[in-house]
Curated annotation (Swiss-Prot):
This is Flagellar hook protein FlgE. InterPro entries: Falgellar_hook_FlgE_sf, Flag_bb_rod_N, Flagellar_FlgE/F/G, Flagellin_hook_IN_motif, Flg_bb/hook_C_dom, FlgE/F/G-like, FlgE_D2, FlgE_epsilon. GO terms for cellular component: bacterial-type flagellum; bacterial-type flagellum basal body. Coiled coil: none annotated. Its main location: other.
Length: 718
């Protein structure tokens, strides 16, 4: 009877423990990071009356044991580490673990390690990351001397998590020092099409072949010793942005006065022949019959073939005056006045070899060494020099070929608006002739007329260019351009607005220059303008990809006490690829330009990423990884010892803590501005309360029943 009594008592005690455990679960239904427990019931030692026996061969069968249980007990309280719900908070230092793992905290700043799932952290007055109970969170902290200004941007977002754990402490007054720019990367297209959407006037050139007085909008004079910037005429555009696209041998004729020839005509001649500019002219005239003089007949015969010779005849008293004003496009046959075969009859006074040459052919060539003797040009300076030379020969024959530009009376320049300009200088007491300029296009059986080039140069046409009077100018010539700007940072954190200008210099060639504000200087800049670097070169492949560039870097001296020279790599793309600069038939446009420098900045705010990295946001717009929270996981989470305050300690049955970063090993991820709720399920807990209550009540019945039986036994004595 005593067995049943004590079994009931044990049952009541066990269910009391279960009630305590479940009540504790319910009490912590709103405790952050709490993990509920359950009572593990086991039966107690049984009293064996008879042991079990095995069957005997040809005898009795086997028998089970005869034993009586002695009640129930609680063997353990099992902690259930299932995932709790994640709830959002407005606190940036709140952390929640999604998956396996525990935060590592210490009550003595790193000597002792405890563990928790409760990520309700905050910074104390010294910048330490602590729990609400004052335990310091453990992890890895960025080296104080490493402020991220020397490595890559990727390195700045990482913390070395291979070292020993530290107390996470962040200086509230942290300052990120400035980082000097050492790289500019750019993605852009430079228009390779027939029409340029962005243009600028070509560089100015002076009549003395000297150099620019300033390096940004060059106006050339004789006061400096810089190299003159001449441009490939074939790569230029007219003022509307239409590309000239000059082909080999395309060009123009320019005359500086009309070709003229005056000859006597024999009036009595009837059969007359003459060869002008390679065209044979003949007529038969009997003035008695036609009542037309040989003078008029000769004029009519010459004018009848004007479209083949370019020559028009006029009556000048009893003489014939021939004139070629260079109005017709064409080849040599339409220019000047050249008697190629002696005349007969009325033309008897025209001798073979008579000529008046005033029109000069200027033809474009791709060669870098054009032959000036035959009027070849490639650059703006080549053409300027040819026009100036020939204009002075026509106007001042005495100067011949040995004149000096600075002494010539005809000055040709390219002005600041990109126009070829001819000026008939006033030479004081020396009487000079006026100029009559005519421009026409060159064409032949093998060369077509470049109308855009001819029309642009026809602006030079003038009835009379008077000595000391107004100059004559062509239309504006432009080159395709594109410009962009970016702020670069020196070692002191000072911004410098750097402007990069591109201009087309050939079919697949572009030049670029770089300008920084004064007093800054660029290595390679001129003595006159040290803040301007000229001479950058870009070459593109026939598919528009970048073939190469030079130079690959700039050297910059801010002239303000910062480190100098500051080397800045120009990352404009890889050779043969489209990852940087391209040149295709598309508008010039910068898609992206960036540099890797930044100014000094104060720590303004923090947040955590999914790896538990504490990211600091600074006033300079930069983000730096300041620390990383460590996580620990165990072979047996249920073996941890609860210490209260949502804190656990390691035990022999939990196994050693395996420490590492979030998202590595079996460790879960970390969510910032979130907390993990208690995993207590009220519906389950309340149901368990009912079950425990019924169990307790049933065990109490066993006690009362045993008591009644004992009373019955006592009554037998009476």
């Amino acid at each position: 009877m005593l067995r049943s009594l004590w079994s009931g008592v044990n049952g009541m005690q066990a269910h009391q423990i279960a009630l305590d455990i479940e009540s504790n679960n319910i009490a912590n239904v709103n405790t952050t990071g709490f993990k509920y427990s359950r009572a593990s019931f086991v039966d107690m030692l049984s009293q064996v009356k008879l042991i079990a026996t095995a069957p005997y061969k040809n005898g009795l069968a086997g028998q089970n044991d005869f034993s009586v249980g002695l009640g129930v007990g609680v063997d353990a309280t099992t902690k259930i580490f299932s995932q709790g719900n994640i709830q959002n908070t407005d606190v940036k230092t709140d952390l929640a673990i999604q998956g396996d793992g525990f935060f590592i905290i210490s009550p003595d700043r790193g000597i002792t390690r405890n563990f928790t799932r409760d990520g309700e952290f905050l910074f104390d007055s010294q910048g330490s990351l602590v729990t609400t109970g004052g335990l310091v969170v453990q992890g890895w902290v960025r080296n104080g001397s490493d402020t991220g200004n020397k490595g890559s941007d990727t390195d700045a977002l990482k913390v070395d998590n291979t070292g020993p754990l530290e107390n996470i402490r962040i200086d509230p007054g942290m300052v990120m020092p400035a980082r000097a720019s050492n790289r500019i990367s750019m993605r852009a297209n430079l228009n390779a099409g027939r029409h340029a959407d962005q243009t600028a006037a070509i560089f100015a050139l002076d009549s003395s072949a000297k150099t620019p007085s300033d390096g940004i909008n060059p106006v050339y004079d004789s006061g400096t010793n810089l190299a003159q910037v001449a441009e490939d005429m074939g790569s230029l555009c007219n003022e509307d942005g239409d590309a000239l696209l000059l082909n080999e041998n395309q060009g123009i004729w320019v005359s500086y006065k009309s070709a003229k020839m005056v000859k006597d005509i024999l009036p009595s001649a009837e059969n007359s022949t003459l060869e002008l500019n390679g065209v044979k002219i003949s007529f038969t005239n009997d003035s008695a019959v036609s009542r037309t003089s040989s003078l008029v007949a000769a004029k009519n015969a010459i004018n009848a073939v004007k479209s083949q010779t370019g020559i028009e005849a006029y009556l000048d008293g009893k003489q014939l005056r021939l004139e070629n004003t260079n109005e017709l496009d064409g080849d040599e046959k339409l220019k000047n006045i050249v008697v190629t075969q002696a005349g007969t009859g009325a033309f008897a006074n025209f001798l073979d070899g008579d000529k008046d040459v005033t029109a000069f052919k200027y033809s474009y060539t791709h060669s870098i060494s054009p032959n000036a003797d035959i009027g070849q040009f490639r650059t703006t300076e080549d053409l300027r020099a040819l026009i100036q030379h020939d204009a002075n020969i026509v106007k001042d024959p005495s100067l011949a070929d040995n004149y000096q530009d600075s002494a010539a009376s005809i000055g040709v320049s390219v002005n600041q608006y990109g126009m070829f300009e001819i000026n008939n200088k006033d030479n004081k007491n020396v009487i000079k002739e006026n100029l009559n300029i005519f421009v026409s296009g060159y064409s032949s059986d093998s060369v077509t007329n470049n109308v855009l080039f001819k029309n642009a140069m026809k602006g030079l046409n003038t009835a009379s260019l008077i000595e000391g009077g107004a100059s004559a100018s062509s239309s504006k010539f432009t080159h395709a351009t594109h410009a962009t700007s970016i702020d670069v940072i020196d070692s002191l954190g000072t911004k410098h607005a750097m402007r990069i200008e591109f201009y087309r210099s050939g079919g697949a060639e572009w030049n670029f220059r770089v300008i920084v504000p004064e007093p800054g200087e660029l290595v390679g800049g001129s003595a006159a303008r040290p803040n301007v670097f000229e001479g950058g070169r870009l070459h593109f492949n026939n598919d528009g990809s970048l073939a190469g560039m030079n130079p690959p870097l700039l050297q910059f001296d801010p002239k303000n006490g910062a480190d100098a020279p500051q080397r800045i790599n120009l990352a404009f793309g890889s050779s043969g690829s489209f990852d940087g600069l391209t040149s295709v038939d598309k508008i010039s446009e910068t898609y992206a330009i960036e540099q890797n420098g930044y100014q000094a900045g104060d720590l303004m705010d923090v947040r955590f990423d999914s790896d538990g990295v504490l990211l600091g946001a600074f006033s300079n717009g930069r983000t730096l990884a300041l620390a990383q929270v460590a996580l620990a996981n165990f072979a047996n989470d249920a073996g941890l010892q609860a210490l209260g305050g949502n804190v656990f300690s390691q035990t022999g049955n939990s196994g050693q803590a395996l420490i590492g970063a979030a998202n590595t090993g079996r460790r879960g991820s970390i969510s910032g501005s979130k907390l993990e709720s208690s995993n207590v399920d009220l519906s389950r807990s309340l149901t368990n309360l009912i079950v425990v209550q019924r169990g307790f009540q049933a065990n109490s019945k066993a006690v009362t029943t045993s008591d009644q039986i004992l009373n019955t036994l006592l009554n037998l004595k009476q």
